Amino acid sequence: MPREIAISRRTLLAGAGTSLALVLAGCRHTLADSAAPFGFPDWSRAETIAKSVRPPVIPARQSVVAAVAEGQDARPAIQSAVETLHADGGGRVVLGAGVWLSDGPIHLRSGIELHLQEGATLRFLGNADKYLPAVLTRWEGTDVWSYSPMIYAHRAHDVAVTGPGTIDGQGEANFLPWRKDQGPIQRLLRDFGRDGVPVAERVFTGERRLRPHFVQFHQCERVLIEGVTLRDSPFWMVHPVYCQDVTVRGIRCISLHINSDGVDPDSSRRVLIENCTFEVGDDGVAIKSGRDQDGWRVGIPSEQIVVRNCIYGGTIGGAVAIGSEMSGGVRDVWIENWRIAKSNHALYFKANLDRGGMIRDVHARNFEIGETAAAVIFTNDYHSYRGGNAPPDFGRVTVENFRVAKADYGLAIQGHPTAPVHDVLVRRMVIDEATTPIELSHGTNIVLDSVMMNGRSVTLADAVPWAPGKRH
């Protein structure tokens, strides 16, 4: 059974502000003593974005898929219901209680909602050939034709996956073993992206196999995924790529092996992620926008994103990341009200010197954290550096109201001499125990306001240079 978080969402949300205020009552360093690097964020912007996200419009008609014999492939019946309803103008495809086996992907169409009722489990099988023919996808930031995601929609509008049921990818047994042979294939795809090989010629199947995504919406508008439990992903779990108006609400992601990111908005606009629980072996939410030259070629940022009221219940991953595939840019992001029992990191801005691109106007507040390797990290030296000369630009970031019990690193910032991390405000942060409170190399206009670690006020005078070693 997955580990349950002992503290309720209501208790955490109610207690965070009070405890932080009490601790900071004796901390006297304020912005009267040091000017903010830029204006304070207007958090009403987050609500404006959330309200601007357009929900899908699904017609009222529905099709209840008839039960199939135990152990039989239900995919033909499910896909037939999708196609029939789509031809009629759209509607809801309903899976009732029981186990529904799918020997291959379900492809959604415009106007379709796949609804899993209480007690329904949609379980995907591991026959790789059934996830062919190849579809257009984006794999770790590079466009490619490869194995279909298990649930996939391409150039669809008004599309949804909803309900209290479960979707089981059986990824650890069937697809994670592909990872051991992945290195050369992964590098080849990155070479194709760097060298500008036409996307139509990037076909990665057979011996060039890449693990499929779990649920991917590709070039879609007005998308909703709500209420479902996603379990045991083959790769990234929910991956909106080149999408607009995406709502992810009240889902639970359970997948404790590597690369099982929960939700990865990728070159997408107007995205709302709220009230979700992540019990994953990687990032709960990772905001992305393409890798290196291929990301520059496309040039679509991720922007106007709100992530709020979520719980991270993994132990070996992290709660929220920006990057590392962020070459198209990430901007106008608002993150608030996270509760984290244990993690490698709470908030991670990551890229390397190949990426280029920029991260701008990202604001995070109200994090309650138990134990973490690093509370907040900025680095442009993330692994897989390929020798380029395109340092990313990180700037205009605020971090406020962070309450941490224990951290190996409190705040760690690694910029580059030609591209320092700049214009960062950290205020009202309390860490009870921090082995290394602050590391800082190549940062400008970094401001700390009411930051306490190890029971005392901390300023930039306490910072030590970034040292080699793992922080996440």
Predicted features along the sequence, with ranges:
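Extracellular "leader-to-stem" segments immediately downstream of a signal peptide or signal-anchor
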Residues: P2-E113, Q117-E226, R249-I251, S255, ...
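Residue-level marker of regulatory loop/turn positions in helix-turn-helix DNA-binding domains and
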Residues: I5, E207-R209, F217, P240, ...
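Alpha-helix capping and helix-loop boundary segments enriched in small/acidic/polar residues
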Residues: A69-Q72, S260, D264, S268, ...
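Short, T/G/N/S-enriched strand-turn elements that build extracellular solenoid repeat scaffolds
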Residues: V82-T84, L101-R109, W236-Y242, N275, ...
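Short glycine/acidic-rich loop motifs that flank beta-strands on beta-rich extracellular proteins
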Residues: G90, D103-P105, L125-N127, S148, ...
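Right-handed parallel beta-helix
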Residues: E118-G119, H157-G165, E221-R231, Q244-S255, ...
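Extracellular beta-rich repeat passengers
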Residues: M326, N337, S343-H472
